[in-house]
Design a protein with these regions (language model features):
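C-terminal motif of bacterial Sec signal peptides marking the signal peptidase cleavage site
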Residues: 18-22
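Bacterial N-terminal signal peptides that target proteins for export
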Residues: 1-9
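Repetitive helical segments and hydrophobic/amphipathic motifs
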Residues: 12-15
């Protein structure tokens, strides 16, 4: 199939999707607020739950889409169709800020625009709803240091390194691990010289960069499986999954090799499987955002904007949370009050949120 045919098909499918109501009646005369995510994932089911709650409370009609593929060219026709249909406001998790800023700037001149989870700061958006991903990445780095205090070998896994969070999260992890003497120092692995990478403090990063999967969960499992083959026999291993589906994908590969407990796993986001696995001890911990609140706040802000109320705009980053099996007391870290809930308690919260959208 030619590239032009594929693009045309994407546009046709997207146009068909956006013509269907996500909730409510398209002829109701209500304000229409549209939300598009960067892919399909339980993380975004939580976002949808929050968005629906805000839509009810603010008396607006909600259009909510989770694209099947993490690609800007899939997202664009959905947004364009919404603009053409006259929606009142749009929230988007930006996939490629550099590549999408020009198009989003045009959108922002026509309707109020909010970015969430992933930012495009030069797009003219009203505000960003999300955590400081570099700070959240540093929290992941602190988990790694707690698990492997004497150093070790690490591998990072993520969907994309073109998105804002795909760049900031790994950067935060590595900044936390680095020392003045070893901040990306190129080296060969001391036990496996065929493995090249970089040292960040006492931690050897295999290949010196994150392994990406383009949002494809099957590829995420394959990446983890391939890495296990390459580091076979290396002690003090920690695999870090930085998108919501990465920790379960890593765990699937680790279980297949009967290496649970031998390969430590640290995650990002609140995938239900990740939370269950922290409670069971198969995953060490995860740093979570608040996708429910992302959806809620995005809709609340846009509904207020349409009605001339600018007071709901957010001026700073949201606080992340650190989830472990045993939890811990709240801490003040870099100006944010950070909570450390037990996995079993946080899982209950997530389960209740998902029930509200029938998941």
């Amino acid at each position: 199939m030619s590239r032009w045919v594929r693009v045309a098909l994407v546009a046709v499918v997207a146009a068909g999707l956006v013509s269907l109501p996500a909730c409510g009646n398209n002829n109701s005369g209500k304000i229409k607020i549209a939300v598009v995510t960067n892919c399909t994932d339980p993380f975004w089911d939580l976002c949808e739950a929050g968005a629906k709650k805000a839509a009810q409370e603010n008396d607006v009609e909600l259009l909510f889409r989770q694209p099947e593929r993490m690609a800007a060219e899939v997202q664009k026709p959905v947004i364009d169709a919404w603009v053409s249909q006259g929606v009142s406001g749009i929230a988007v998790s930006v996939i490629d800020p550099k590549g999408q800023t020009e198009d989003l700037t045009i959108v922002a001149k026509k309707v109020p625009l909010v970015t969430m989870d992933n930012d495009a700061p030069d797009s003219g958006r009203i505000c960003y709803v999300g955590v400081d991903n570099k700070e959240a990445g540093r929290a992941v780095g602190r988990l790694v240091k707690k698990i492997l205090p004497n150093g070790g070998t690490i591998a990072l896994f993520i969907g994309s390194t073109t998105s804002a969070n795909g760049q900031a999260r790994p950067a935060g992890v590595l900044e936390e691990l680095a020392t003045p003497e070893a901040n990306g120092t190129r080296a060969k692995h001391p036990l496996r010289p065929e493995l090249e990478g970089k040292y960040y403090g006492k931690y050897f990063l295999v290949d010196g960069e994150s392994k990406t999967d383009d949002g494809l969960k099957e590829r995420a499992v394959t990446n983890a499986r391939d890495m296990l083959n390459r580091v076979d026999g290396v002690p003090d291993l920690c695999f870090v999954g930085l998108y919501a589906y990465n920790p379960p994908a890593i765990l699937e590969a680790v279980r297949a090799r009967s290496l649970v407990g031998k390969v430590k796993i640290v995650g990002f986001d609140e995938n239900p499987e990740t939370l269950k696995s922290i409670t069971s001890g198969d995953i060490e911990g995860t740093v979570v955002q608040d996708p429910y609140n992302y959806g809620y706040k995005s809709v609340e802000i846009l509904a207020a904007e349409v009605r001339g109320d600018h007071s709901k705009r957010l001026k700073g980053s949201a606080a992340y949370q650190v989830i472990t099996k045993d939890g811990g007391p709240d801490q003040d870290i870099n100006g944010l009050r950070i909570k450390f809930p037990k996995a079993v308690d946080y899982e209950r919260t997530v389960r209740d949120q998902l029930k509200s959208v029938g998941k």
